[in-house]
């Protein structure tokens, strides 16, 4: 590969949720050419000049038309929408790590924790019953929080929760070296990290090792009054066991932003549970930003210069 051959950054864009026009205008400022799939392409024609993709949940049949693809940039923090299908194995997959997105998700988690801590679910029920009844919130010292996953977002959340006076534990699949935090890692320490917490927060990605990692066995380890918050991936939770736990007072409530199948089926029992707060995968909403456009350009030039690429995922791990 020579630098001259790949100086132009030509990007194929696909997303049913993100604005092509906004991304096109942002990328043009970085001299990056953006083309929308399938609108800007002739059917069944190959495009070797396209070297980069910017996508969310792309159809796998599109990849064959771009034989020289080198970078696939996800439009979200997760990459399972790429890895769970056939994709160009020679391409480097990049997760979106935009400070704006990370802070959005951190804010959502803080909101959720406070809703649980102040028992807002019960007030919602009281409102329907026109019941004027004051409820004593949890003592923060007795409202332990366990976070599953220790990435960028988790680190932001931990810092803010500790500043607010909450006791926080964290678990990750692989060993890290966090400071000033009760830390657990590996499958053998998962249950130890959850035991006696009042609030379980999942930031886990969807991989073969995290699929259905959370279920009744984990919920039963929590305190009597306890809550579950999921902003990671829906496939990490056994949804039927979650419904059972919520229906049988094993969990006092749940705040759910992600589900095993999205949109959430209208027949799902989760919709009818008073102790569940549902949002449609909006904890972090991707915006077209100069930060991401600049990072896309930097990563492309890093690739052709044989330098380190930022936010590259390890395909075998899934994150």
What does each model-found stretch correspond to?
Residues 48-124:
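Phosphate/diphosphate ligand-binding glycine-rich loop within oxidoreductases
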